[in-house]
Amino acid sequence: EVLWDIGAGSGSISIEWCLGHPKNVAFAIERRRDRISLIKANRKKFGLQERLTVKHGNIETIAKDLPTPNAVFIGGGVTSDLIYQVIKVLGKNSRLVINAVTLESQALLLKKYKQFGGNLKKINISKPKPIGGKTIWSAQYNIIQWSFKT
């Protein structure tokens, strides 16, 4: 299956996708040039040069050169226009998953959930932190995740 990983960051989603099945391929799309080298280094570390393609730029200009995705993950930079663009190219039985940490992005995902349905989740992550000789849970970012299947 084909994954588009938009806002790929470190490439971890693309890497896990490729490791999940020997025929899976991924396209890691990232606007930030400083992250491209990190994705490429991680791709090499896992020996995925043949199945993980790294693209620098915006999905709006890159999409026309990519194969139709079976799944799309948006990890950053989500906008309403981007969601509509991605939904238009999804084939039958395809999946869209979006993570959001900012209030603005989270509000957008709530709106799209009400519009299209799917699944909406709030993921809370905490890490242990020492305090006064004891340990407490220190909350990290709350993540809202919307997933949608065609």
Positions of predicted regions on the chain:
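Short glycine-centered segments of the SAM/dcSAM-binding site in methyltransferase folds
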Residues: V2, V25, R95
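Conserved class I S-adenosyl-L-methionine
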Residues: V2-G9
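Conserved SAM-binding loop of SAM-dependent methyltransferases across substrates and taxa
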Residues: S10-K23
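The conserved SAM/SAH-binding core of class I Rossmann-like methyltransferase domains
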Residues: W4, F27-E30, N99
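Active-site segment flanking the S-adenosylmethionine/decSAM binding pocket
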Residues: T53-I98
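S-adenosyl-L-methionine
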Residues: I29-A71
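Helix-to-beta-strand junctions that scaffold the AdoMet/dcAdoMet cofactor pocket
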Residues: H21, L48, L90-K92
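C-terminal substrate-binding/active-site "lid" region of AdoMet-derived donor-dependent transferases
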Residues: Y84-I144
